[in-house]
Each structure stands twice: as structure tokens, then as C-alpha cells.
A protein has these predicted regions:
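An N-terminal alpha-helical hairpin/helix-loop-helix interaction module that forms a charged
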Residues: 1-80, 96-183
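Contiguous, well-ordered alpha-helical segments that form the cores/surfaces of helical PPI scaffolds
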Residues: 86-94, 108
């Protein structure tokens, strides 16, 4: 709830179960997000409103979000860790039917294993990797939607306490993750 009275507490609670998606060895976007939200909740609320505004191109939202966190972290001699992966987590949690969680290493390995070609151009946006990843995931999703047996298997593994993944984005990300890690 972006309009929550205690925004920093709501934000911490909303992402606390993201686990290793937002915290890992020497990678702390969750901690920095919470720290900044506690210090200046209205600034962070404004950054999330802008990040979630689908009328603004993703590259602009990403740059402005990072700049906002940079303005907080740099004077403290800290890193903000708000990279493409963290942004993709925030967007996927807000719009799970539209976004896929991006992890560069997994994407790179998976695309090489399946022969997904990436054409590099001189005019690439700051989010071109996420855009290419999304295109690849959409191709996978198109195939997933044709496989009724796979869809039923996925539905059977989700109980009432789970997000039901009606758009099959989590299933698609599972395919990419396991294909990148274990194929």
C-alpha cells in the first residue's frame, strides 16, 4: 500500500519475505531501501510512485529511481544496490502479470544454452538487458501456455497460501532459472 501512513514499515513488511531476491553476499538492496525509507519515507514513497507509473518509459523510471537512492547513499559513503535485478523484483511484486524477475547471470547462461541471440546496437537504453530478457521470457511463456500438462503440474504444486500465478510468469521464470542453473 503505497499510501500507508507508516510507509517505511509497510515497505519493509512488503519485501521482507523476498529473501535472497533482495539480499545476498555483499548485495543489500532491501536493507538500503528500508534504511532510506526510515530516514526519508516521503522521498522513497515518491520514488516508488514514479517506478510504478506505467506511463513513464522504463528506462526513465529506472534512472530516476537509482538517482534518488544515489542521492541518499553517496553522502553516507554507501552503495544503494538498486540495480536492474532489484528494480525487476519491485516491479514483479507490484505487477506480477507483466514483469519477470531479471537476474543477469541466469539470463546469460540460459540464453546461451537455448541459442537465444541478442543483437547489440549502439543506441541501447539503460534497461535493454531487461527488455531483451522480457522478450525471451515472453517467447517461453507463449510455449508454456500451449502446454496444458505443464500448467496443470504448476497449479497442483500451489496451495492456497501461494500466489496462484495465473499469468504463468513465475512458471516461466522457474524454467529460465532451472535451465540456467541445472541444464
Amino acid at each position: 500500500d503505497i499510501d500507508a501512513v507508516d510507509f517505511s514499515m509497510m515497505l519493509a513488511s512488503a519485501f521482507e519475505k523476498a529473501g535472497n531476491l533482495l539480499s545476498a553476499n555483499m548485495y543489500w538492496p532491501y536493507d538500503m531501501m528500508v534504511e532510506f525509507a526510515e530516514a526519508n519515507p516521503e522521498a522513497v514513497r515518491k520514488l516508488f510512485r514514479m517506478l510504478y507509473n506505467e506511463n513513464i518509459p522504463l528506462a526513465e523510471r529506472y534512472a530516476a529511481f537509482r538517482e534518488g537512492f544515489e542521492g541518499y547513499a553517496k553522502p553516507l559513503g554507501k552503495k544503494h544496490y538498486q540495480d536492474l535485478h532489484a528494480i525487476s523484483v519491485y516491479l514483479s511484486f507490484e505487477y506480477p502479470e507483466k514483469y519477470f524477475i531479471f537476474k543477469m547471470k541466469i539470463f546469460s547462461i540460459f540464453r546461451k544454452r537455448v541459442g537465444y541471440a541478442v543483437e547489440k546496437t549502439k543506441q541501447q537504453s539503460s534497461v535493454w538487458k531487461v527488455e531483451i530478457y522480457t522478450q525471451m521470457c515472453q517467447l517461453i511463456l507463449d510455449e508454456v501456455q500451449k502446454d496444458s500438462e505443464l500448467i496443470q503440474m504448476s497449479k497442483n504444486r500451489l496451495d492456497d497460501s501461494c500466489y496462484q500465478d495465473e499469468a504463468y510468469h513465475l512458471l516461466t521464470m522457474d524454467i529460465v532459472f532451472f535451465g540456467g542453473m541445472y541444464m
